[in-house]
Curated annotation (Swiss-Prot):
Family, per entry: Belongs to the YheC/YheD family.
Keyword Disulfide bond belongs to the record: no
Function: Involved in sporulation.
UniProt protein name: Endospore coat-associated protein YheD
Entry's Gene Ontology BP terms: sporulation resulting in formation of a cellular spore
Compartments where located: Forespore outer membrane; Spore coat
Keyword Membrane carried by entry: yes
Keywords: Membrane, Sporulation
GO cellular component: endospore-forming forespore; membrane
Bilayer topology annotation: Peripheral membrane protein
Length: 453
């Protein structure tokens, strides 16, 4: 049956009993479940209960329910499931309950609060918080008075929010993911960062997305630099596993050779002339392994007030597991910046700020939405595991053609600092939990649909 939302409370006059509204009456109900915790109990019905479900105090605690809340009730296979219980997986914990995730504490508090307001239970955890023998986790929950630790069951579904690739590659974290997925059949979404080159290859092979892609090659060489710089006004060399616009080089052919612009990790901008590709590559190799980089065709982007502009488009799966476009923003290059990243001095504008003409604005929305949804479907078809959100960087050239530069499985959220984009910030977060609810329900009612043999 479809889940329905109820207030979850405690009955202090009974023992080991789950009280349901009469509207949910079914024969043969034997168990109550919360997350992966299942307890045999007596199920009774009360006519006066309409939007409330009550549990005997001992049953409430045995199921490890952390507090009264609003949650979905899903009845399947003689069991009443309360939830969903969503675990947000991360790393980088501190001992402080005031700021348990350092600078990310505010982000996680908003995420947990948003989910619990919508219905269900949500906590943050890491590999070290799992008690494998007991099948429990010491999770961090955010309540009115701040962060608190509670022992909860293993969750119905995991939303991966590891902060970076280096941490993701930890053997402990890889083992933790594998064990929860393989042994406990817990759906885990956005479980890896995308590799730029792997994504490019997947999209390039599919006729639905190949037309969006600028020419890209792995491992810049003298021959490739000469060829691409001869064919295009600008060429970019970027890390295959980069983030936030770091480590990117812009190459332009000149009468005297090459001009190379770069913003380093310290955000210092440089522009250096080289006599030829060989001299640049020799200097480049002193600091980098070329096989970790790709070389990409530059695109003559549309401009806003004389500065190049591109677009961040977010897609999320919804409560039905369907892709939706949740946010579109314009990113405008900063002074002396070779990218539009905010970390390199770029600025964010809404579409309405850039396109005065409503008809033109609608046309841009249609173009970008169609491209983003198509790319989302293709990546879903070809990448193993569950994907619930993607952040795309698109460009539109001077001729109106759409180009796709990047896809990120854990997109940055700096665009949402714009005051007119706060509402879509909440929407993208809400969609992630809608998809978590979808995965949780499917894992309970039809696991074969999630993990076909």
């Amino acid at each position: 049956m479809n889940p329905k939302r109820f207030l979850i409370g405690i009955d202090k006059t009974s023992e080991n009993t789950l009280f349901l509204p009469s509207s949910l009456k079914q024969d043969g109900l034997l168990h109550a479940a919360f997350g992966t915790k299942v307890v045999r109990c007596h199920v009774a019905y009360r006519r006066h209960l309409e939007q409330t479900v009550l549990l005997s105090e001992n049953l409430f605690h045995e199921l490890l329910l952390p507090h009264r809340s609003r949650a979905d009730i899903l009845i399947h296979d003689h069991t009443v499931h309360i939830g969903p219980l969503v675990g947000i997986f991360t790393a980088g914990f501190t001992v402080s309950l005031e700021r348990p995730f350092k600078d990310r504490s505010l982000f996680f508090s908003k995420l947990v609060t948003l989910h619990e307001q919508a219905g269900g239970y949500c906590f943050v955890f890491g590999a070290h918080q799992i008690n494998w023998e007991e099948g429990t986790i010491e999770g961090l929950l955010y309540r009115e008075n701040g962060w608190e630790k509670k022992i909860v069951p293993l969750p119905n579904v995991v939303y991966d929010r590891l902060p970076n690739r280096k941490i993701e590659d930890s053997l402990l974290l890889q083992h933790t993911k594998k064990r929860l997925i393989d042994e406990y059949q817990i759906p885990w979404f956005n479980k890896t960062f995308f590799n730029k080159w792997n994504v490019h290859q997947l999209l390039e092979k599919d006729p639905r997305t190949a037309p969006f892609l600028p020419r890209s090659e792995l491992t810049p060489s003298v021959e490739l630099i000469d060829e691409l710089c001869g064919a295009y006004k600008k060429v970019y060399i970027k890390p295959a596993n980069g983030a936030l616009g770091t480590g990117i080089y812009q190459l332009t052919r000149t009468d005297g050779g090459l001009t190379v612009k770069h913003t380093n990790d310290a955000k210092t901008f440089t522009s250096i002339d080289y006599s030829d590709a060989a001299s640049f590559l020799a200097e480049f190799q002193k600091h980098h392994n070329p096989s970790d980089f790709l070389i990409q065709q530059g695109v003559d982007l549309i401009e806003f007030q004389g500065k190049p502009a591109d677009f961040r488009v977010h897609t999320n799966k919804n409560r039905k597991g369907k892709w939706t476009v949740t946010a579109i923003a314009v990113k405008i290059s900063g002074k002396n910046s070779i990218t539009t990243h905010l970390s390199n001095g770029g600025t964010v504008k809404t579409l309405a700020e850039v396109y005065d003409d409503p008809a033109e604005r609608v046309e841009v929305i249609k173009k970008l939405s169609a491209a983003a949804l198509t790319a989302s479907h293709v990546l879903h078809d070809h990448i193993e595991g569950f994907i619930g959100e993607i952040g795309f960087d698109f460009g539109i050239d001077q001729n109106g053609k759409v180009w796709m530069f990047e896809a990120n499985s854990r997109p940055g959220r700096s665009i949402f600092s714009h005051p007119n984009l706060h509402h879509v910030d909440s929407l993208t977060k809400r969609r992630s939990f809608e998809y978590a609810s979808y995965l949780s329900e499917k894992a309970i009612t039809s696991p074969e649909a999630l993990w076909p043999s």
